Amino acid sequence: EVKETLDDIRKSIVASVEDGAPREAIELLSEARYRIFDTMVEQQRFSFLAIGRPETAGCYCKVNAYLKEVINLLANDFDYVVIDGEAGIEQINRRVMEKVTHLVLITDPSRKGTQVIDTIKRVADELVMYDRCGAIVNRVTDPALIPYIHINGTEILATIGSDPQHAANDIQGLSVFDLPEDAPVIRGAREALTKLEIL
């Protein structure tokens, strides 16, 4: 259960600076580091940090700038940092992910979905430095349709079939870690990670 988000921490530290005596940058960084690690939800073999959303409408600039620094901070303490970006090109345009090792794009098999992925890839080619890029196509209802799924210039790392058990788990508040090893999403993730040479 998430008790505090990254944006909560940012606003709290900003408020403490505005209300109190001036503080050195190193002190603020140290406090941020401590609170970020304290806020993480620890699970077996991974940790989760919720970004949160600004309460005011409009610009995400402050959150984005802070998020960039946090990503750099975390990268030194974890083997992998996975950033789950919002759907669409907004996250790319905000330049939160300026440099990554692997850019993995997720879509359903619809023509509209694959066209969006194509657009995101073209924008990312201009704004993001990455070593490898690929797509995962999920919710595939009919394996016979797989040969017709195509994304210009992007390798399809895996196709994942629709899974009633996964849907049932989601309704019950269970995670993918509660699925059996042969579940479509587990097999698809393993296939994608193998192609990316992470596994």
Predicted regions and their residues:
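N-terminal phosphate/diphosphate-binding loop that engages ATP/GTP or pyrophosphate donors
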Residues: 1-42
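C-terminal alpha-helix
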Residues: 188-199
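Cytosolic-facing regulatory segments adjacent to core modules
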Residues: 27-83
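Conserved active-site and cofactor/substrate-binding residues in soluble primary-metabolism enzymes
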Residues: 62, 115, 180-187
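Short, small-residue-rich loop/turn micro-motifs
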Residues: 53, 164, 170
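C-terminal boundary of histidine-terminating zinc-finger modules
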Residues: 170-183
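Functionally engaged cysteine thiol sites
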Residues: 1-11, 55, 59-61, 91
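Conserved catalytic-core segment of NTP-binding enzymes
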Residues: 60-162, 168
